[in-house]
Amino acid sequence: DDCSSRGLGDVYKRQSVGKPDLSTTIFGRKIDMPIFLSPCAMQRLYHHDGDKASAKAANKFGTFYSMSTMANNTIEEISNLSSGPKLFQLYVHKDQSITNDLIDRCRRSGFDGMCLTVDTLVAGNRERDYRTGFTTPPKLTLKSLLSFAMHPTWVFNYLIHEKFKLANVATKTDKGTNIAKSVIDYINEQYDPAMNWKDAEYCVKKWNGPFALKGVMSVEDAKKAIDIGCSAIMISNHGGRQLDGSRSPFDQIKAISDAVGDK
């Protein structure tokens, strides 16, 4: 009917779509698309180039690359490799000198922004890992040996390239951070479960640049993040892996955006 016709007409605005401009600005850097690479630990598990490959890809497509504290390459390696926009994902450590060192190295290496993860103070009960048999350090089982046999290229690259380690913190523990040391062990040994708002504010001030709080799930926390000087927030993307009884992060977007989206 006539009402439906007018309503449908409103849907299809007469906008030029010949060459759409997808660019936007984040942390003072213009990027070519409203998408960037989120930090991901241990990227060499799926490709021998690890973070190097991700940084190159982000640079190629004109967007942010984000580095995890638990990356397999160093801050300096990535800085020398890519001139594109870069973000570092930080955790508050029990030993504050480790936290300070990571912040200082990022500043010297020209990183554009920093985010502090606040929803992984302890390791989650990763049920999928139990089902698939994934462990660090790896356990040689019939299933894993079969998987290695089915992926000879991965095995070959693992054998000929440098050994796995958490490159940015490899010298910070007596036991080291090679593949023989569980990532979960490092989290439990080094991450500070007593982290609070004062710790977050300390990191914001020490970085003294574009800073995001990563892992926010409530309007109250979003407002508090702005109050302590954060320039952005990241709604939790860990979801049920960390706390399976929580709401979906997607369901929190509108309320948080309405509360602090213009700040």
Model-identified regions with their sequence ranges:
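Single conserved hydrophobic/aromatic residue that forms the stacking wall/gate
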Residues: 2-8, 12
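Hydrophobic faces of well-ordered beta-strands that scaffold small-molecule active sites
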Residues: 35-38, 63-67, 86-90, 114, ...
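N-terminal amphipathic alpha-helix/helix-capping segment at the start of soluble metabolic enzymes
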Residues: 14-35, 196-198
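Acidic (Asp/Glu)-rich catalytic clusters
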Residues: 75-83, 226
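Glycine-rich active-site/cofactor-binding loop and its immediate structural neighborhood
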Residues: 31-70
